[in-house]
A protein has these predicted regions:
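Short linear, low-complexity motifs centered on an aromatic residue
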Residues: 132-140
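Short helix/strand-capping turn motifs
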Residues: 1-122
């Protein structure tokens, strides 16, 4: 079964940790408040509970060509635990399995640029530097 499709000009935020509903709601509220325009398609589906990168890559590779998405942002235990809600960005297309973290503060910029193909996943992943967390260009 393919991953859920994000709404037009948004990216998919997929919940994989179901241990704290209040934390998920706080993350969704932070996403809603991070930008004037909707930039996320949040999905809370228990079938993705504990899903790892390899499982998501397998699901996506089984999808039809017109159902594939290029990246997904995971709301895993790490994202739900911290006040910055550092989502795990996962490349599903160019370098499948490549990841970096992105605090919600930076998510709207990344989502917008990826959804219109203004920038690509690798540019953000490269800018994440040794910490593995994107905090803007040249600020890590």
């Amino acid at each position: 079964m393919p991953l859920p499709q994000p709404h037009d000009l948004t990216t998919l935020v997929l919940r994989t940790d179901f241990g704290d509903d209040a934390a998920w709601e706080a993350l969704c509220a932070a996403l809603d408040g991070a930008d004037a325009y909707p930039c996320a398609t949040p999905v809370s589906d228990p079938r993705f509970a504990g899903a790892g990168i390899q499982a998501l890559l397998a699901e996506e590779s089984a999808a039809g060509e017109d159902e594939r998405i290029c990246e997904v942002f995971l709301a895993d235990a790490t994202a739900l635990a911290g006040p910055e809600h550092p989502l795990l960005a996962v490349d599903l297309f160019t370098e499948p399995g490549r990841t970096f973290r992105v605090p919600v503060r930076w998510y709207p910029e990344i989502s917008a640029n990826l959804s219109i193909a203004n920038m690509d996943f690798a540019e953000y992943a490269d800018a994440a530097g040794p910490s593995g967390t994107f905090r803007g260009f040249g600020d890590d």
